[in-house]
Regions:
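Generic structural marker for isolated residues within well-ordered, non-membrane alpha-helices
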Residues: 42, 78, 161
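Oxyanion-binding and handling regions
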Residues: 1-22, 29-36, 90, 94-235
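DPxDG-like acidic metal-binding loop motif
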Residues: 60-89
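Charged catalytic carboxylate motif
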Residues: 37, 41
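Short glycine/serine- and small hydrophobic-enriched flexible loop segments
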Residues: 43-44, 83, 188-192
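Short glycine-aspartate micro-motif
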Residues: 2-4, 56-62, 70, 109-112
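Phosphate/pyrophosphate-binding loops at sites that engage ATP/ADP/AMP, CoA/4′-phosphopantetheine
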Residues: 42-57, 146-154
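Phosphate-handling active-site elements
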Residues: 49-54, 82-92
Length: 235
């Protein structure tokens, strides 16, 4: 069974299963709850499935961009599970788990999340019969620059404050900017070329925080080293 973990936003989402179909899921709202809630949520999923942690064959982590503190919670737990059990370690762009909701062959879909400061984290993907092609890699953008870079996508899925969401009115035929993250979709991306990425060295891997944050600066000062910028193509 695959265990999917998304702690990139204020909603903690975990799922257990082979694919989104038939998977079991738990969500906990509140960014400050992630550290205390993640392991109990995983244990509840295992209990509901009637299995132990030995049944987990791979761990799939949402790798950002998103909250520095939230991402580190998911990364720490995911790495610990992988190192302890030797199972596969996969990563998925957090925005891709939103964009898949509007996917269909030939469609370009956009995943969005709030980046504060009048910006949003955005990424765009083209869905092909044989895989997924990145059109715009995930990064922080202003609504105006995003609309200029991609004039007419087919679907836009994300979660934004009302003031930011209003700037995307009429941008796409399908627009859902009140979509809660759901880790079940991450399970499907492991089987899609261009979706999830298998990491060969989990201990050396770091997620995509999107941009430096105060929490990141404090972490680097405490540990005496800079966090590397992740490469989705390596590792």
């Amino acid at each position: 069974m695959r265990l999917a973990i998304d702690t990139a936003t204020s909603r903690l989402s975990v799922a257990l299963g082979r694919s989104s179909t038939g998977a079991i899921h738990e969500a906990v709202d509140g960014a400050r709850q992630h550290a205390a809630a993640l392991l109990p949520a995983i244990d509840r999923l295992l209990s509901r499935a009637g299995v132990s942690r030995d049944a987990i064959t791979s761990v799939v982590i949402a790798d950002g961009p998103g909250s520095f503190t939230g991402l580190r919670v998911g990364v720490a737990v995911g790495k610990a599970l992988v190192v302890a059990s030797g199972v596969e370690f996969w990563t998925v762009p957090s925005l891709l788990t939103r964009a898949i909701v509007g996917s269909a062959p030939g469609r370009i879909t956009v995943g969005l999340s709030d980046a504060l400061r009048g910006q949003c984290y955005a990424g765009a993907w083209l869905w092909l019969p044989g895989g997924i092609e990145t059109i715009l890699p995930p990064e922080a953008r202003t609504p105006a620059s995003l609309r200029a870079a991609l004039p007419r996508p087919d679907a836009v899925i994300g979660e934004l404050p009302a003031s930011t969401a209003a700037m995307f009115a009429g941008w796409a035929p399908y627009l859902d900017l009140a979509h809660h993250v759901d880790a079940r979709w991450m399970l499907d991306l492991v089987d899609r070329p261009g979706g999830a990425h298998r990491v060969a060295d989990p201990l050396a891997w770091e997620p995509d925080y999107g941009r430096p944050a105060e929490a990141q600066a404090l972490w680097e000062a405490r540990h005496g080293r800079a966090l590397p910028h992740p490469s989705r193509g390596g590792g």
